[in-house]
Amino acid sequence: MAEERKDSEESPGTYSCSKTLRRRGEITPNGKVRYETTQNKAAGITKTNFFRRLVLSIVMISGFCWISVNDKIYSFGLIIFLTISIIREIIGITRKSDGRPFHLRTSIILGLAVPIYSYLVFPSIMMMYFSRVSKCFLRRLSFVCFYSYVAAFMCFVASLRKGRLKPQLGLFALIHLSTYTMAIAAKCAIFNLNKGRFWFVFPALLVISNDISAYVVGKSIGKRPLYRLSPKKTLEGFIGAFIFTTAVGFALGHLHVNSGFLRDADSEQFQKFMKFTVFGANVRVQSIYIHIIPFIFVASFVAPFSGFLASALKRAYKKKDFGEAISGHGGIADRMDCQVLIAIFASTYISSFIYTEERSVGSVFSLICRNFSHDEIMILIEMLNRRVESIRK
């Protein structure tokens, strides 16, 4: 009792100090001092989802930039790895609803998906890197892929069972949807890379900046949901992401033409000025900035719709994420859904407005050297000589 009275007779300053420390969390309610408050707070921060997303985002962006500035074969490998991983994750969301044994399901998926992907993607790489040795292989590739697909198709139809038709046919449709879409996206990304590193990296960085800024702005000031099937996306984040993506797009364009950022042999054409008349005034703008504008609009307003489709697909199968490959982000498909559409757009825009198929002497020469053997070139020279002699006569 005496000790309790003594404690109660503590000075007001001591009581105030104790109360302040307790409010700060440095003294627990039972009176013990917590000495590792800072460490506990730091440990709590490192375990948050935001911290994991931040660290992994930095690692992924750094890795992508390193791959992009090195030999193109690394970029080809990245494209193949990402697209195959996305196909696996999309098909994987039907795992519990299919009802087939694991070995039969896996065999059917590989039998249907591999021939389609191989037929659409591998010729693009073979013609670029192995053109001299791949002619015989490419002539027979379509034959091998077709009959491999037919065999898998027959096995799939034979394995259909009553009572499971809906999920089994859903798997069949999802295999074709994912494989065709990813194969086309991979082929377009390879095309973009061959036209210049900038046209491979630039669209991807636009989507990355749009995705990050939409998340940050939405978390900070977002109040109005943007899409009912994706409630975490907000209208404020959508608008803020467009503003930030515009700034990033013009900054990357400026670095490309003025600072040597991902410069290629054909980059000089984008330094040329284009003249416009705006309200009676003559305006001169470098052509790169004109080409950048469509990419900004597609990355900000069109590419997110592929993300909305991915959200709808996950909800249809009652899944939160496509996978758990990236901690804090979900699966690879959750992060790459918008990249698919921008890669396809980039290839169509490049072939339509930038590198049109107008043959020149230099392009024909490069084509001959890339695709013909020494003996075939000598035969071609003899044919051209005979043609020249006939014209002179």
UniProtKB/Swiss-Prot annotation:
Top-level enzyme category = transferase
Q: Which UniProt keywords apply?
A: Lipid biosynthesis, Lipid metabolism, Membrane, Nucleotidyltransferase, Phospholipid biosynthesis, Phospholipid metabolism, Transferase, Transmembrane, Transmembrane helix
EC number in record: 2.7.7.41
Q: Which sequence ranges are marked TM in the entry?
A: 49-69, 73-93, 108-128, 141-161, 171-191, 198-218, 237-257, 290-310
Gene Ontology CC entries for this record? endoplasmic reticulum membrane
Transferase is among the record's keywords: yes
* Superkingdom to which the source organism belongs: Eukaryota
The reaction(s) this protein catalyses: a 1,2-diacyl-sn-glycero-3-phosphate + CTP + H(+) = a CDP-1,2-diacyl-sn-glycerol + diphosphate
Q: Its family?
A: Belongs to the CDS family.
**Could you tell me the Gene Ontology terms of the biological process aspect for this record?**
CDP-diacylglycerol biosynthetic process
The identity of this protein, by name, is Phosphatidate cytidylyltransferase
| Membrane topology type | Multi-pass membrane protein
Signal peptide as annotated in the record: none
Major subcellular location class: membrane
Q: Does the keyword Transmembrane apply?
A: yes
Pathway listed for it is: Phospholipid metabolism; CDP-diacylglycerol biosynthesis; CDP-diacylglycerol from sn-glycerol 3-phosphate: step 3/3
Query: Which cellular compartments is it found in?
Result: Membrane
Q: What InterPro entries does the database record attribute to this sequence? A: PC_trans (IPR000374), PC_Trfase_euk (IPR016720)
GO terms for MF? phosphatidate cytidylyltransferase activity
Q: What is the lineage of its organism?
A: Eukaryota, Fungi, Fungi incertae sedis, Microsporidia, Unikaryonidae
